[in-house]
Structure formats: C-alpha cells, structure tokens
C-alpha cells in the first residue's frame, strides 16, 4: 500500500506514543543533534525499516519528514535497503545534508550492503565526500572506507587521502583514527610504516593507538610497538 502524507503522519504519531523517556535521555547524552529525540531503540527502528522496505519504499521516502531524530534514522535505514545502484545514489546524495551527528552517519553507511557490492563506486564516492567542508559529510566518506574498503588495493590509496585531509573536527578525527585502527588489524606493517611517517595530528595518533590497543585482534607485541611509536612521535 502506498504511503500518503496522512498515513505518514499517523504512523509517526504511533511511533511517538512508543517513545521511552529514559532512553531519550540516554540518547541525548551520547548524540548531539538538532533534531528532537523520541526515544526509540535501534533494533525497533531496523524492524520498522524492513517492513517499510517490503511495502512501498519509494512512496515512503516521498513522504518522509525530518522533524525528529528517529525519522532521520528511519530514513537512513530505509535508504540503506535499496538494492538498485542508481536509485540508491539518488536518495543517498539527497540525504547527506540531513546528517548532523555520528549516529545517523554510521547507521547509514554500516547498514548499506550495496556499498560492499559496489565497492569501486563507493570508494570513489568516499574520495569525493572527504573533501567536503561539512564534517559529517566528510565523516561519511571515511566511514565508507573503514566499513567497506579495508581490503585489496584500497588501503594503500587511503594513506595519502588521510595525509591531505585538513580539519580539526572531532568527529572526523575520530573516524580517521577508527579507520587507521581497523587498517592496523588487517594491514599492520603497511599502516605502521604510515604512522611512523608522522603525518597525523597528535590527537589522531593518540586515538588511533588507543583504539588499536583495545582490539583483541592485535598481539601484545604489536600493541607494545604502537605504544612505543606513539611515545616516540609525541613529545
């Protein structure tokens, strides 16, 4: 059944009636966003997105509004379920301006299975996005890299992109550190050599080593090497 403005309005009213005040308060502490928060958990929103995607996905997206944080999250999850590349890219590009927090950014990218299936396309897309002056658009690019492109020939291409990226955004810096910590797991030697070249800010290097040392997939010897590297480079 197609979505209409009235059906959508009634649907959102029902969602709002299911909001959890305590979960809303928790979300407000960990997500900084301009959108009012209802207090709905991610597993519930994912189930709703699946239902919508089986129903009439495009008519839903024609009605969707951005009045609450959960509506934006739900839109991201529905877009992530699109399987046709051209259709996906159309909605993806239009959605980027709505992203104002790490949770929506990471949800969109991590839920979009099409990005792994069309890896070349989205690696190119990521290279474009990281040039954006909008921090959460740039973060989308780096999260695409770490979620879908830590494989094959892509990592070697990432290092100069990281070096040339210029921003003091906390959320982009954290995404870069996250990316490098993931690269250390599967491409330890190459990534360690890159870290030793000392192109990174003190903040990103510290966060990279911290995240890497939290991983159970690196050996004690590797973690000791990274800690020593950090100590040597940060004066």
Predicted regions and their residues:
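Alpha-helical scaffold domains
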Residues: 1-235
């Amino acid at each position: 059944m197609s979505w209409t403005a009235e059906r959508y309005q009634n649907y959102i009213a029902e969602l709002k009636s299911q909001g959890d005040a305590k979960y809303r308060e928790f979300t407000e502490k960990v997500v900084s966003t301009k959108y009012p928060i209802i207090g709905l958990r991610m597993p519930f929103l994912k189930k709703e997105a699946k239902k919508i995607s089986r129903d009439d996905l495009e008519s839903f997206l024609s009605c969707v509004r951005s009045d609450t944080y959960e509506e934006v999250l739900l839109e991201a999850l529905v877009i992530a379920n699109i399987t046709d590349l051209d259709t996906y890219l159309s909605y993806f590009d239009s959605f980027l301006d709505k992203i104002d927090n790490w949770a929506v950014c990471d949800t969109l990218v991590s839920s979009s299975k099409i990005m792994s299936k069309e890896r070349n396309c989205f690696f190119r897309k990521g290279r474009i996005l990281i040039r954006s002056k909008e921090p959460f658009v740039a973060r989308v690019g780096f999260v695409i890299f770490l979620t879908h492109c830590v494989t094959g020939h892509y990592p070697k291409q990432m290092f100069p992109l990281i070096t040339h990226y210029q921003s003091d955004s906390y959320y982009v810096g954290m995404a870069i550190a996250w990316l490098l910590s993931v690269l250390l797991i599967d491409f330890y030697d190459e990534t360690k050599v890159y870290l030793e070249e000392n192109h990174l800010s003190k903040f990103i290097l510290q966060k990279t080593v911290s995240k890497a040392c939290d991983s159970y997939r690196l050996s004690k010897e590797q973690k000791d090497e990274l800690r020593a590297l950090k100590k040597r480079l940060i004066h």
